[in-house]
Amino acid sequence: MKKIGVLTSGGDAPGMNAAIRAVVRTGAYYGIKVMGIKQGYVGLMTDNMEEMTARSVSETLQRGGTILQTARCLEFKTPEGREIAYANARKEGLDGIIVIGGDGSFRGAMELCKAGFPTIAMPGTIDNDISCSDYTVGYDTCLNTVMEAVDKIRDTSTSHNRCSLIEVMGRRAGYIALEAGIACGAEVILVPEKEWSFDEDVLRPVLESKARGKKHSIIIVAEGIGGVMEMAKVIEEKTGIETRATILGHVQRGGSPSVRDRVIASEMGAKCVELLLEGKENRIVRMKDNKVCDIDIAEGLAMQKTLPESLVNLVPKLTV
């Protein structure tokens, strides 16, 4: 193993730079040349790569986003597109590739393995929705960003006796909504995984909150539920309580990564390099029971992940 490539793919997440840095510096430690592949699989398609050194990744640990940039590459999903990518990887002499991203990126990693390129994947996504891993890089920073935003919205909601709906990311998974909702003392948390009734699960808690003398109501809604603007209008019409909706959007993806994200990303990045050195391939580096370990990509993608029942059951106890 003399030369490897590293790419970030899909949505960006805080901590990706810490992972890239760990890959590059661990590679340098073992005498391996590391090529940074720009814009994810697009960089493989266009042969957009450059050598990275221990010095070139200095001052990146604290930066949000990804210094390699990222993109979604539909062409790589076609056999013809993949052949172009494989030819470029061969031309660069890559002995292995490390992919940082979500489940779609992992499927691309499996294709690379089939083509004869030893590939290791690691989870970098704010959604925390990788089935085989207890944690994904970027999640903690995202939660802190949401918490800070909701705390500020609460300040102005209290001043105006308002109900505030806040939409957070999570198209298919409600981890951000659930944990941020608990951390922010939300009266209502709506996630895609749980059935809900507008009258029982939204209107009733808002009215009960007002009856108890509270000066605000906070409703956290996962992106997969959506419709917060219309929901706000209906709440105001039916309760008479002034209601406003906020979509936090891409602010959740940015910002300097937290300590947790920097440390876990560094651990995972180093582990990726070491697995390649051990001759392993087609693996996902994951967090399981607070330990960094690995699992076969196909096996990992086939697993199911559910919201922690302990947290789901905690919500009604905290909203009395």
Task: Give residue ranges: language-model regions.
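Flexible, glycine/charged-enriched surface loops at secondary-structure junctions
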Residues: 32-38, 156-163, 215-219, 242-248, ...
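N-terminal phosphate-binding or glycine-rich loops at protein starts, especially the Walker A/P-loop
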Residues: 1-45
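Short, acidic/small-residue loops that bind anionic groups at enzyme active sites
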Residues: 113-138, 145, 190-194, 247
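Accessory alpha-helical/coil subdomains and C-terminal extensions
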Residues: 99-101, 111, 139-242
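Short, ordered loop/turn segments at secondary-structure junctions
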Residues: 9-12, 37-42, 72-73, 102-104, ...
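Glycine-rich oxoanion-binding loops at beta->alpha junctions
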Residues: 44-97, 104-105, 137-144, 148, ...
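Short Gly/Thr/Asp-enriched flexible loops that form oxyanion-binding sites at enzyme active sites
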Residues: 18-23, 104-117, 177
